[in-house]
């Protein structure tokens, strides 16, 4: 919520207030558990404790999927969730990042994807450094450039038709709809050679 001499505004999410009133994050306060906001007819506002506070147990469903990704805390949490997947992903592809393409579905998974990519790039940087150091100065300039040229492979592999929402369909019709809701970017990977890693946050009714 935000209160000034001219306005009192309450919203379910902080970024909305920041955008409308052009406020820094420090100016928007959070109503704590057990508290209420009472606004009188004359404009006086009071924040009161109406119930003893209990343990805070935020819903991961809301933090991962429903909340606005433009909130600074939500953004950083989603990036961290992606970064934390790094080691398990590397194990699943046998640490073969040269034959693995990374992408995301749907667009709301993009923030976690950035965190995953940062984790993967940090891992690859360590591999490059260790390989160069292990050769004890015996590498030529061309060999060093070859090592440094290794990159995490990333592509926009699936493009969703924004008019179609699979989780609101029912039964067999949903399976048929889900099969056509994404358009694949053809030629971006080699069948039978490349691994494909997709980060997906469709936890409502993911397909």
Identify the residue ranges that each predicted region occupies:
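N-terminal segments that mediate ammonia production and transfer
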Residues: 1-189
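A phosphate-binding catalytic loop at a beta-strand-loop-alpha-helix junction
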Residues: 195-207
């Amino acid at each position: 919520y935000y209160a000034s001499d001219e306005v009192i505004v309450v919203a379910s999410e902080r970024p909305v207030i920041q955008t409308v009133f052009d406020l820094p994050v420090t100016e928007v306060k959070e109503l704590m558990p057990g508290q209420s906001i009472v606004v009188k007819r004359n404009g006086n506002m009071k924040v009161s404790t109406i119930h003893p506070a209990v343990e805070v147990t935020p819903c991961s469903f809301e933090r991962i999927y429903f909340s606005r990704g433009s909130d600074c805390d939500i953004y950083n949490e989603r990036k961290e969730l992606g970064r934390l997947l790094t080691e398990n992903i590397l194990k699943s592809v046998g640490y073969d990042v040269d034959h693995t393409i990374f992408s995301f579905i749907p667009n709301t998974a993009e923030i976690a994807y950035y965190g995953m990519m940062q984790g993967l790039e940090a891992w690859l940087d360590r591999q490059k450094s260790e390989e160069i150091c292990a050769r004890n100065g015996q590498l030529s300039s061309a060999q060093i450039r070859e090592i440094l040229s290794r990159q995490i492979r990333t592509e926009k592999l699936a493009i969703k038709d924004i008019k179609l929402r699979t989780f609101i369909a029912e039964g067999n019709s949903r399976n048929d709809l889900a099969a056509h809701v994404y358009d694949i970017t053809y030629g971006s990977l080699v069948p039978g050679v490349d691994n494909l890693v997709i980060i997906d946050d469709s936890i409502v009714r993911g397909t």
